[in-house]
């Protein structure tokens, strides 16, 4: 069967197929207010294709697209012709109504709006390093590019702009090599990044005052402090104009979080950190704007699979797909549209995400995972070879999740989600230690995290140890209101280190107690010298991802956490006494 015929059959089947239960173990309710939350796809989709097949997406619960390759990166001129979607246009810069890409996009957006797809946006990325923060001329040029993008988006009847700031993560850290040059004004760096965020957003608002703005990923929890400063500057500019479209932070840490508790913890963490960043900026107007018009949009990644292929030295040499389909053959990052998790897991994730979302849930499409074109269609629509690759056999199961939206039948989860999406969840979790004592950082064998080191053999608060930073001893530090023990902030960027954290609890009697734990990345938890939990992988830290059952003796007990980093921008953990234990008179104490 040719791809175009298969696509037509899929299209027809979507009109008649009835919803079915995709997860017999979960309990769902039909969403009684399905219009409250809109579903958006992040996708490379040709405008001509979307124009012709918009009814298919509308019928399957899609409300918008973050459209890539209209303006790829910050340094691009959106008016320049030709483009991938207008390959036959004469070369040159065509500004305004005569621009062929603008006309094409406007026609598509008008068609989409007629069918209820109202939230298309131009997706722009920081694919190239930004200019130096203090280069005024270069930043004026950058802001002008974004201003023109906003003008184009407004004239083409997009609903707004999506900005992806992911690809220059190293620039957001204060130890970036360019900032270490003698004479560089490092003391002004953070305020300058905030100012650039204001300028960037002001340029877009000037061109498109009513735009909706999506920002991805959750930079305040994923990157260094300059990303948070950029974010706070953007919110300040939006708040100054009380821009009606709002700012919507699109989370990526939630991509494969199919368990509701994990999804809840990640969205909660992002919102609390966002409020902390804005409060620290001392711009009360920005914080109030966030609470009125800001939101976290949970990101999901059900389809589109890839894995790295490494050489003997551990260097990446390419990407493969599912091993059972492609073995270790290098096929490219976007060549396998297979599932990352089942339709049943997607149903559960989407049902939880709808409760947590204030306005939007977004789905990352790693490749053109929800459609397949024939080669003739690819040419006609000016699409790409990826559009012609086969979709999963049970695509309809995934589409039905979107077409017939459900929410979890769990009143406790629903009530907690409402607090989080309304930015009122600050004290939702309790039982965190007010202080921890930390020792580190230490180097460790990534293949042997379990190997005992001196601090876990004997606890001596007065002893000195040789660490990666020189001689060190136990240091007492407070825990912020989110409960996250941020070892990366405490120790700075190290090369995949580990550290020890120490605290004490007191129990009124001998009793069973539950501890909620979550770590980034690997960790062992010891209670009174005995290992009660061990995880030797890589993951995001999520509140209560693991529930650790222990029996505490009457009196004082020692809790030691050994936490290791396996790369990335984050390293730390959550550990708390669960509520029932608090009622039974278990509390944090000093030694």
Question: Where is each model-derived feature located?
Answer:
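Accessory carbohydrate-binding/adhesion or oligomerization-edge regions at the termini
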Residues: 415-487, 561-591
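Extracellular beta-rich ligand/substrate-recognition surface
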Residues: 489-499, 536-541
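Bacterial Sec-dependent signal peptides at the C-terminal "C-region" and cleavage site
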Residues: 10-26
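Extracellular and analogous surface-interaction loops
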Residues: 501-513, 549-554
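Beta-strand-rich ligand-recognition modules
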Residues: 527-574
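Bacterial N-terminal signal peptides
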Residues: 2-10
């Amino acid at each position: 069967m040719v791809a175009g015929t298969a696509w037509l059959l899929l299209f027809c089947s979507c009109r008649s197929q009835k919803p079915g239960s995709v997860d017999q173990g979960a309990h769902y309710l039909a969403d009684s207010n399905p219009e409250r939350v809109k579903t958006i796809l992040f996708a490379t989709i040709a405008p001509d294709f979307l124009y012709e097949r918009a009814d298919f997406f509308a019928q399957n619960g899609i409300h918008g697209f973050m459209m890539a390759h209209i303006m790829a990166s910050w340094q691009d001129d959106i008016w320049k012709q030709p483009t991938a979607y207008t390959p036959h246009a004469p070369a040159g810069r065509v500004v305004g109504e005569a621009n062929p890409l603008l006309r094409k996009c406007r026609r598509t957006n008008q068609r989409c709006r007629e069918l209820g797809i109202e939230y298309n946006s131009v997706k722009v990325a920081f694919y190239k390093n930004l200019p130096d923060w203090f280069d005024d001329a270069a930043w004026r040029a950058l802001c002008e590019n974004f201003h023109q993008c906003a003008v184009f988006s407004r004239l083409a009847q997009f609903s707004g702009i999506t900005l992806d700031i992911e690809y220059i993560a190293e620039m957001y850290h204060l130890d970036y090599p360019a900032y270490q040059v003698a004479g560089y004004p490092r003391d002004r760096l953070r305020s300058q990044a905030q100012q650039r965020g204001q300028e960037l957003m002001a340029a877009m608002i000037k061109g498109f005052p009513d735009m909706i703005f999506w920002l991805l990923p959750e930079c305040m929890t994923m990157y260094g402090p300059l990303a948070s400063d950029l974010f706070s500057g953007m919110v300040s500019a939006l708040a100054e104009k009380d821009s009606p479209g709002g700012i919507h932070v699109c989370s990526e840490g939630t991509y494969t979080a199919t368990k509701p508790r994990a999804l809840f913890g990640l969205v909660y963490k992002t919102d609390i950190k966002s409020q902390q960043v804005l409060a620290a900026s001392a711009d009360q107007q920005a914080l109030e704007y966030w609470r009125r018009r800001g939101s976290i949009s949970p990101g999901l990644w059900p389809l589109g699979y890839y894995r790295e292929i490494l050489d003997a030295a551990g260097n990446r040499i390419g990407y493969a797909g599912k091993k059972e389909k492609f073995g270790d053959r290098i096929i490219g990052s976007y060549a396998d549209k297979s599932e990352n998790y089942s339709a049943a897991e997607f149903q559960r994730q989407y049902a939880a995400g709808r409760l947590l979302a204030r306005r939007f849930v977004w789905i990352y499409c790693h490749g053109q995972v929800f459609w397949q074109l024939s080669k003739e269609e690819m040419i006609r629509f000016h699409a790409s070879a990826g559009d012609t690759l086969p979709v999963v056999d049970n695509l309809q199961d995934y589409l039905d999740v979107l077409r017939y939206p459900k929410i979890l039948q769990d009143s406790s989860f629903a009530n907690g989600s409402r607090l989080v999406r309304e930015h009122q969840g600050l004290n939702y979790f309790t039982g965190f230690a007010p202080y921890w004592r930390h020792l580190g950082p230490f180097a460790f064998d990534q293949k042997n995290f379990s190997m005992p080191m001196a601090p876990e053999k004997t606890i001596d608060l007065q002893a000195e140890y040789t660490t990666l930073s020189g001689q060190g001893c136990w240091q007492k530090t407070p825990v912020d209101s989110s409960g996250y023990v941020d070892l990366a902030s405490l120790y700075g960027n190290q090369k995949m280190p580990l550290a020890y954290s120490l605290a004490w609890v007191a129990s009124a009697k001998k009793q069973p107690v539950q501890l909620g734990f979550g770590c980034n990345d690997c960790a062992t938890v010891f209670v009174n010298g005995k290992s009660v939990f061990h995880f030797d992988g890589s993951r995001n830290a999520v509140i209560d991802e693991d529930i650790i059952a222990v029996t505490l003796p009457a009196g004082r007990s020692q809790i030691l956490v050994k936490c290791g980093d396996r790369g990335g921008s984050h390293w730390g953990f959550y550990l708390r006494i669960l509520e029932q234990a608090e009622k039974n008179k278990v509390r944090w104490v000093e030694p």
